[in-house]
Amino acid sequence: MTIRLHDTNARQIRDFVPLTAGCVSIYLCGATVQAAPHIGHIRSGLNFDIMRRWFAYRGYDVTFIRNVTDIDDKIIAKSAEQGRPWWSIGYENERAFNDGYDALGCLPPTYEPRATGHIPEMIEMMRGLIERGHAYEADGNVYFDVRSLPGYLTLSNQELDDLRQPSGEGETGKRDQRDFAMWKATKPGEPSWETPWGRGRPGWHLECSAMAHKYLGSAFDIHGGGIDLIFPHHENEIAQATAYGDEFAKYWVHNGWVTMSGEKMSKSLGNSVLVSEMVKHWRPIVLRYYLGTPHYRSMIEYSEEALREAESAFARIEGFVQRVTEKTGEVVPPADEVPPAFAEAMDEDLGVPQALAIIHTTVRQGNSALAADDKEAAADRLAEVRAMLGVLGLDPLDPHWAGEGDRGEDLHGVVDTLVRLVLDQRQSARARKDWAAADAIRDQLNQSGLVIEDSPAGPRWTLGPR
């Protein structure tokens, strides 16, 4: 079946037809590194990580670009406020973003270009736009002439005459107040670069148009980002690129927000939950399940209750994986192919919720096989489950998650040793038929969040839901 994606520009789900057979090129607007990431930022990267994994499973050669905006007004303002170099703020937060992506199991991009490393490409694009009559210089600034492009605002489905001047775009010398800055003239104390029009720094929109052109050429398959980027950022990217002569992106794919009390999670609103704090209290694989299993276009309302539900749901999957592994005495490899129903769900606009239902159904079938002592059927179901989980980046037996890193593996070993000591005491109580003492030990372990299961091979423990 053909992969189908919701194209924001077409306002419908379309068949994906690559520009080059067997290849897919994706540009994702990545981090603006003025602060450490919250889970809303990481959700976007995670959604597109699932997309690239599915394309790879379907046999595509994937080129995935995720940029870093390492210079903008907020970074400069924070630099002045903290008395630190602008670049040190950017590098520190870029590392925090990459730590967050890695913690939640996102594969590294093919390239992750920084805006400040591509000033020559931006200058070349501005020169071309000025020559074509789509841009002009005024007082050291370079503006895009929005009235020069008839198709402007098609992506966001707006009318130019209804458009208000964007906030923060009150620079002098504009022909039309709706024209947007591609290059901002230098100001005292701000970083700047030399151009034919004087020293200055790039505007946000120019950066992505220039970097997408450099790494993916004049035409590429998919441009992605959060829905808040549709206007003005993506609209202005399209304007610059198409006026420059590029075909630019064939499909526009946007993910929903993480919200809190109905409002978008945002640094500026002060309602953000940092990834670095979340991973102290929740297993990263549970966070990935929580953020990655709703449909990418839906909103996720943040709550502790929803996280606990995700934790419980994943525990059922993980428990099945552990039980079959113990029963068979070996690590069952993933199947070569996912079940057809799972593939059908993923092909239809990355229908992860529907695909997840197939996983849970397969887990139930596997548990029934275990109950019937049918090891072969249980192993077959586990192979299917692992194949499906692998596509979603959620296979608990994947090396990335096995022990959840060295620190997690060490901690698990310490906890296992301590629990085994307590379980030995329980076994001794059972051996002398002191059932009250044995039950009391089990109850205390349960109250600590551990689930104890008695099996012919002896007691085993797992983490229970919170």
From Swiss-Prot:
Catalytic activity: tRNA(Cys) + L-cysteine + ATP = L-cysteinyl-tRNA(Cys) + AMP + diphosphate
EC id: 6.1.1.16
Source domain of life: Bacteria
Cellular compartments per GO CC: cytosol
Pfam families per the UniProt record, alphabetical: CysS_C, DALR_2, tRNA-synt_1e
Cofactor section: Zn(2+)
Binding of Zn(2+), residues: 29, 208, 233, 237
Quaternary structure, from the entry: Monomer.
Protein name as it appears in the record: Cysteine--tRNA ligase
